[in-house]
Structure formats: structure tokens, C-alpha cells
Swiss-Prot record:
EC number: 1.-.-.-
Keywords (A to Z) from UniProt: NADP, Oxidoreductase, Virulence
Statement: the UniProt record of this protein carries the keyword Oxidoreductase: yes
InterPro entries, per database record: NAD(P)-bd_dom_sf, PRISE-like_Rossmann-fold
EC top class named in words: oxidoreductase
Residues at which NADP(+) binds: L54, A286
Protein name: Short chain dehydrogenase sirQ
Length: 393
């Protein structure tokens, strides 16, 4: 029976894949799921179910040399030699904004993982590598102008022109996998989600569900039942986009792993369907917290959510105590990412034809993805369970 290993299991993608692998529908597909993290993480802290098939291990640093990684895998994980399927979601992005440095670091980590797993797991047959929609240059869309797209963004779009293409780590990672897989008995695929909406046990620099959840939940505490204007720009308010629910992403990874018909190196977009706009979505998200979501207040939206939090710093402790929340999380929110995500003024939704042609038919509304993530955060005491009829504090 198949044995899976997930690299980056404490991240938003890896956590979702691990949970999907543990789901009852896949119980007969994988006899063991090995979830790997760099930093120490207990099962209780992880929020993953207590399942005999799950092995949670930490301290596997892919920035070390490959011989050290091989030695640690063999020393700490006796069952690593039985692995047949790898799900790779480990990224190093938080230490720098330099795209060239990120490309070099992440490409090296990927090569180290592949060379290590080839050595320790002779039955290796499949590697799913997560990249993302920035393969299409979303980061540079405003620079590209009319050269961006066209939308919907399809997997076979040509790469960006130089010098922009030279800084994108996803191109380098795909080229690395093509080289490493040449002539091998295993296949790999390139999975490209858009911005991922989901839960994760630790603060993350790219968690849009957490930042929007805290923004709205704290608003609901300060001004319950009132209007909350969209904090992004007017241009972003009507731009069409698609986000990717964590559960959809996890289930699609498992779906591909259980198929034998994909081509080596094939790329797949995966996202919620249909696409949406903040004009449609923001009122629904605000409504979850008993608020009335409205259009942005000005051309450029609210300038700085972090400053707004600091301006209300004296109210945070009372908010956390009222709802028995874990303290201090609000001050760790990546507001820069929140600001960027809510101010993209261009259409950028993904084409999902290819993923549907594999037989994958799970669709999820964007509102549902946020609510699923928020309920997990509420259970973990990260967000409050709000009485929407409450009076102002």
C-alpha cells in the first residue's frame, strides 16, 4: 500500500494536504502519512487528528547538505524507506524580499529533497511540487500591463519576458524537476493554486484567511453590527480573481496522486469556482461577523491596517480575555500581505479546464473556504466565537 510524506506539513498547503490524506475517503489509499516540519511541532499543537497512520516529525532542514538530510531522515523516520508518494510544499520566503535569493534558496531545497528521497525511498513513484499562480507573473502584473495574461490564466501560457522571468523561482523549480526526473522511474507534477484560504497552527506570512478574519473580528468587537468599508482600493474592488480553498487544494493533491494517467511534469491550476470579486465577497465575509461590508471609502482604501490595530492596542487584551483567545496573535498578523492582497487592481482568475479533465469535480464557494478556516481558528482559540447580537463593549 502507498506511503506518503509531506514536506512543509505545518504550512497552509502542507497542513491541508496532510489532513486530506488522513480523510476517511483516502483511508485505503495510504497506509502511512509522514508529516515533516522544520521547526518542532507537537500533535496537539498541529491541530491534526490523532490517527495511527500519522507520523509527525520535525527538524528536517532542507537547507542543510543532502548527506545530512539523508542521515536525519533515516535516523528519525524508520519507515521513510517505504515512501511511494511525496507532497512538497516547503518554502523559504520569510527571510528576504529579494526574488533572486528566494529562487536560489528554494531551488536548492527542492534538489536536496529529491536527491535525498531518491536515496532513501527506492519505491518512490510520484512527487507533487506546489508552485502557484505567480507562475503567470501576478507579482509583476502592473509592470507587464497588457502583456499580462490573458485571463483566464492557463497552464500553457508562455513564460514572462526577461528580465522578469529570471527572478521567478517557480520557473527555476520546474526546470530543476524536469532535469531531476529525466530517465527516472518516478513522475512529478506542478500544482498551481492561487492565494490559499485556510487554517494553519502557526502564524504565517501568507495567510489571507487569518488576516481578514482578525480584521473583521476585531471590528466586530469595537463596532458590532456596523458598516466596515473594504480596506482595499476602488480598482481592486471589482477585479475578478479566484482563491484556492485549503480543502480543495489538499483533495486535488490526493486525487492526482491516486491517478496513473498524468504526464511527467504536467502542470495543473487549482482554485475555487466560480471566480469572484471583492464587491461580491466582502459583504459576505463581513456578514459572518455580524457586520455590513461596504465599498471602499476612497480611491486608495484604508492606508494601513497595522496602524489601525496599534491605535486600538489598549482594547486588544480585553477582547482576547472576553473570548478566551490565545494572546498576542493579532500583533503577528502579516498586514503587508493583507494590504497587497486587497489592492490588486487587475483580473487574474485561473482556468480550471485541465484539472477538471482529470475527473476532479470538487467546487467550493469562496465564502465557504473562509468560513471553514475561521471555524478551525475558533476551535483553536485564535478567533472569537461572536454573538452577533451583542452590544458594543
Amino acid at each position: 500500500m502507498a506511503v506518503a510524506v509531506v514536506f512543509g506539513a505545518s504550512g497552509i498547503s502542507g497542513w491541508g494536504i496532510t489532513k486530506a490524506l488522513l480523510d476517511a475517503k483516502t483511508q485505503n489509499a495510504f497506509s502511512k502519512i509522514i508529516a515533516l516540519t522544520n521547526r518542532s511541532l507537537s500533535l496537539a499543537e498541529s491541530g491534526l487528528p490523532d490517527d495511527d497512520r500519522l507520523q509527525l516529525h520535525s527538524g528536517i532542514d532542507l537547507q542543510a547538505n543532502v548527506d545530512d538530510v539523508i542521515a536525519k531522515l533515516r535516523e528519525r523516520i524508520p519507515s521513510i524507506g517505504n515512501v511511494t508518494h511525496v507532497f512538497y510544499t516547503a518554502f523559504s520566503t520569510s527571510h528576504t524580499d529579494n526574488q533572486l535569493m528566494m529562487k536560489a534558496s528554494n531551488t536548492k531545497m527542492l534538489r536536496t529533497m529529491v536527491e535525498a528521497m531518491e536515496t532513501v525511498a527506492p519505491s518512490l513513484s510520484f512527487i507533487a511540487v506546489q508552485t502557484g499562480s505567480n507562475h503567470y507573473g501576478i507579482l509583476f502584473a502592473e509592470v507587464l500591463g497588457e502583456r499580462f495574461g490573458p485571463v483566464p490564466l492557463k497552464e500553457d501560457l508562455p513564460r514572462l519576458p526577461s528580465p522578469l522571468r529570471d527572478s521567478l523561482m517557480f520557473y527555476a523549480m520546474a526546470d530543476e524537476m524536469d532535469e531531476l526526473s529525466r530517465g527516472k522511474s518516478w513522475k512529478w507534477c506542478d500544482i498551481r493554486p492561487d492565494m490559499i484560504v485556510g487554517y494553519l497552527p502557526r502564524p504565517n506570512s501568507h495567510s489571507i484567511a487569518e488576516s481578514i478574519g482578525y480584521y473583521l473580528a476585531f471590528h466586530a468587537y469595537l463596532t458590532p453590527g456596523e458598516e466596515v468599508p473594504f480596506p482595499g482600493s476602488e480598482a481592486a474592488w471589482n477585479a475578478k480573481f479566484s482563491l484556492t480553498g485549503q480543502g480543495v487544494l489538499g483533495n486535488f493533491n490526493v486525487h492526482l496522486a491516486c491517478k496513473n494517467s498524468i504526464e511527467n511534469g504536467e502542470a495543473f491550476n487549482i482554485a475555487n469556482k466560480p471566480f469572484t470579486t471583492w464587491a461580491s465577497l466582502w459583504p459576505l465575509l463581513a456578514g459572518y461577523w455580524g457586520l455590513k461590508g461596504t465599498a471602499p471609502v476612497g480611491h486608495h482604501g484604508i492606508p494601513d491596517a497595522a496602524s489601525w490595530v496599534l491605535d486600538n492596542m489598549d482594547r486588544v487584551k480585553g477582547w482576547e480575555e472576553k473570548y478566551s483567545m490565545k494572546p498576542g496573535r493579532l500583533f503577528k498578523i502579516p498586514w503587508r500581505y493583507f494590504h497587497w492582497a486587497l489592492n490588486m487592481p487587475f483580473d487574474r482568475y485561473l482556468d480550471l479546464t485541465r484539472c477538471e479533465q482529470t475527473g476532479f469535480q470538487q467546487h467550493e464557494e469562496h465564502k465557504e473556504s473562509f468560513e471553514t478556516a475561521w471555524k478551525c481558528m475558533q476551535e483553536a482559540k485564535l478567533l472569537p466565537i461572536v454573538d452577533k447580537s451583542s452590544t458594543p463593549p
